[in-house]
């Protein structure tokens, strides 16, 4: 077992570490099929060997060539550390700056086997959300961070540490870009080749920006989504006895089970990967499991009748579950489901993100690498069956929404019946959850703010929970609009119940949907608590990229923007640059995330609070921009809620001056002006 000191000493070369290959007992990423030419295979190998001196290249070349041909990528398994990968307390990292140690804390959390989906392939979540492309990059990055001073910035090119460059103490310590390819080459096919060559990487969202906090990171948003789906579609506040059916128990989708329990409904979640299902059950995120469809339906009926709170994991394909629910409806007249969605990794449907109903899990894993064309055909056939079952249930009082995972987009490409008559190209038969629910929340400036206590002490997290609750209660007492008060009340309920629901997996972290005012106030309160010693170590502030300003994604985050700019990425890019200018400790900008490669531009940040006045100033400045940027853009697109919020924010901050839109007063003016 190596130490953190050894881990940060660079690439171990003399002697080389033992090549232990792929580990047993942990899930592994599906085999990739980049279809490289012989010349491209040589280039991939040449690129990998750049990290190593000539005296070890011959030995490593044979290993790396075998990895490339066997797994479709060079992961450099020999250099996978033997040390336990987890978020160690910040004081244990051998660093010259606290900021660098905090970044190390976050990186190692992303690769913790309790957190990461495929830890040995450096995938945190989403099937292909990489932290790094290979283990040499990880080791070099840790070495650079251990040497970094307050007058250097580490530059990351899609997993590759380009090096430490001189900068000012107020500059970011780390700047990350992932997948920044020329737009004409941003196709799925090109990505597979470029990733195999080791020159780009799909960082998902918080995987490649080192800000993932386990499935808790999406629980709060899922709670708000299901809660508001009940309000909007069912007209109720209390979801007792209501059934929510969906799929996925992975790094992000695993949140659905916990969210169902928190909102008090019956959640039935299908998962084809037994390892993922067992992992969530052992972590207490899933109450019951079954691999019998008959038992699943019987248990669902029982819980529905008794109005139990239940999260039930079905080990099987969700298409079988949907088709069985149709069978029950057609034979008994009983509709057993009220709400439905899907969280398969449909952004990556042909390489392990979606498993076709016609095959077992192992059969699918084999076919996707041995015959990709046949596998794609089965996936698309399965998607058509999937949608057909949902369409039948939707003829009754059942409501389905797309969870921003490209499910309806891929279903459309597969020829499924998801078209909406008279709709634009961003709309389908069923709404995106952003269009009907989260879009208005974002427009009011609320989004998935989060923080991580780098001490690793649960008591520090408890202090932050108390501080956040007090901040929100004070905001309500000071007076807020009714729509904002509803958000605050939902968030107070969340933070009060967070500890009870054992949400922490990995680092001592908390997610809380908050607006600009709330984020700034919480940050200031936490920073003051660090200064006074109530919190023992620095706290990292961050957020999901899936936020007010962080992501341009026409089929998810910006799907409720209707002025034609939903396909433009100025907001996300400006956010990345603006955060860097205003005090972020690190920033990241990614291609892809959520809906998939080429469909999204998104970014995130990390901001280390250390109890200093400078940290408070940075938090005030950066967090204000990080929210107002997106609210201003949503206002300009014509969203009335965003208009109201940005006007209020300008009244409170004389330095903020935003261009406001004028509505066309008379629609006939347009028609008359364009008359032939």
From Swiss-Prot:
Binding residue positions for NAD(+): 126-127, 204, 251-253, 271, 317-318, 343-347, 354-355, 403, 594
Cofactor(s) annotated in UniProt: NAD(+)
Protein's pathway: Amino-acid degradation; L-histidine degradation into L-glutamate; N-formimidoyl-L-glutamate from L-histidine: step 2/3
Keyword Transferase found: no
Keyword set, alphabetical order: Histidine metabolism, Lyase, NAD
Gene Ontology cellular component terms for the protein in this record: cytosol
Gene3D superfamilies associated with the record: Urocanase like domains (3.40.50.10730), Urocanase superfamily (3.40.1770.10)
Top EC class, one word: lyase
GO molecular function terms listed in the Swiss-Prot or TrEMBL record: urocanate hydratase activity
The reaction(s) this protein catalyses: 4-imidazolone-5-propanoate = trans-urocanate + H2O
EC number in record: 4.2.1.49
Keyword Ubl conjugation attributed: no
NCBIfam families: hutU, PRK05414.1
Record-stated family: Belongs to the urocanase family.
UniProt protein name: Urocanate hydratase
Organism: Mus musculus (Mouse)
């Amino acid at each position: 077992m190596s130490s953190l000191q050894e881990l940060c000493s660079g690439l171990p070369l003399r002697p080389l570490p033992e090549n232990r290959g792929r580990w047993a007992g942990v899930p592994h990423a599906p085999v990739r099929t980049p279809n490289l030419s012989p010349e491209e295979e040589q280039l991939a190998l040449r690129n990998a060997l750049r990290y190593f001196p000539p005296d070890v290249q011959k030995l490593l070349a044979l290993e790396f060539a075998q990895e490339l041909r066997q797994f479709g990528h060079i992961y450099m398994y020999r250099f996978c550390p033997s040390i336990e990968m987890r978020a160690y307390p910040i004081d244990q990292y051998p660093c010259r700056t606290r900021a660098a140690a905090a970044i190390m804390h976050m990186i190692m959390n992303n690769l913790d086997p309790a957190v990461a989906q495929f830890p040995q392939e450096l995938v945190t979540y989403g099937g292909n959300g990489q932290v790094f492309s290979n283990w040499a990059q990880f080791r070099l990055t840790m070495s650079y961070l251990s040497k970094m001073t307050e007058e250097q910035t580490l530059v990351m090119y899609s997993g590759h540490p380009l090096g430490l460059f001189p900068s000012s103490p107020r500059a970011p310590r780390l700047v990350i870009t992932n997948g920044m390819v020329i737009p004409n080459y941003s196709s799925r096919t090109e990505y597979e080749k470029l990733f195999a060559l080791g020159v780009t990487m799909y960082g998902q969202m918080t995987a490649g920006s080192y800000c993932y906090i386990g499935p808790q990171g999406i629980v709060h948003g899922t709670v708000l989504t299901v809660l508001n789906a009940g309000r909007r579609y069912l007209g109720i506040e209390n979801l007792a006895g209501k059934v929510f059916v969906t799929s996925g128990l992975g790094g992000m989708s695993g949140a659905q089970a916990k969210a169902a329990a928190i909102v008090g409904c019956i959640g039935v979640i299908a998962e084809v990967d037994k390892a993922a299902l067992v992992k969530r059950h052992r972590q207490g995120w899933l109450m019951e499991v079954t691999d019998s469809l008959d038992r699943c339906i019987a248990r669902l009926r029982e819980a529905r009748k008794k109005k139990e709170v239940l999260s039930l994991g079905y080990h099987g394909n969700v298409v079988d579950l949907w088709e069985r629910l149709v069978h029950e409806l057609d034979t008994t007249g009983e509709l057993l489901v009220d709400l439905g969605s899907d969280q398969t990794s449909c952004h990556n449907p042909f390489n392990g993100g979606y498993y076709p109903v016609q095959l077992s899990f192992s059969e699918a894993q084999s076919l996707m690498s041995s015959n990709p064309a046949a596998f794609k055909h089965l996936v698309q056939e399965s998607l058509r069956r999937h949608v057909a079952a949902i369409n039948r249930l939707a003829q009754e009082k059942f409501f389905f929404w797309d969870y921003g995972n490209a499910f309806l987009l891929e279903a459309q490409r597969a020829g499924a019946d998801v078209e909406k008559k008279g709709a634009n190209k961003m709309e389908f038969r069923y709404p995106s959850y952003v269009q009907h629910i989260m879009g208005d929340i974002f427009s009011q400036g609320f989004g998935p703010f989060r923080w991580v206590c780098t001490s690793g002490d649960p008591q520090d997290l408890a202090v932050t929970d108390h501080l956040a609750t007090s901040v929100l209660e004070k905001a309500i007492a000071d007076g807020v609009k009714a729509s904002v008060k509803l958000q605050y009340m939902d968030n107070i309920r969340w933070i009060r119940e967070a500890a009870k629901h054992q949400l922490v997996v990995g680092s001592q972290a908390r997610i809380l949907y908050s607006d600009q005012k709330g984020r700034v106030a919480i940050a200031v309160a936490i920073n003051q608590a660090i200064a006074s010693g109530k919190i023992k170590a620095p706290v990292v502030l961050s957020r999901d990229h899936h936020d007010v300003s962080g992501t341009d994604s026409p089929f998810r985050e910006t799907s409720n923007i209707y002025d034609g700019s939903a396909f433009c990425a100025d907001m996300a890019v400006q956010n990345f640059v603006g955060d860097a200018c205003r005090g972020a400790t690190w920033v990241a900008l990614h291609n892809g995330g959520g809906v998939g490669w080429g469909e999204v531009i998104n970014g995130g940040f990390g901001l280390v609070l250390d109890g200093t006045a400078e940290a408070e100033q940075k938090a005030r400045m950066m967090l204000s921009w990080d929210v107002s940027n997106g609210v201003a853009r949503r206002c300009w697109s014509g969203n009335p809620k965003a208009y109201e919020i940005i006007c209020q924010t300008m009244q409170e901050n004389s330095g903020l001056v935003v261009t406001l839109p004028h509505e066309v007063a008379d629609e006939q003016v347009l028609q008359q002006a364009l008359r032939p």
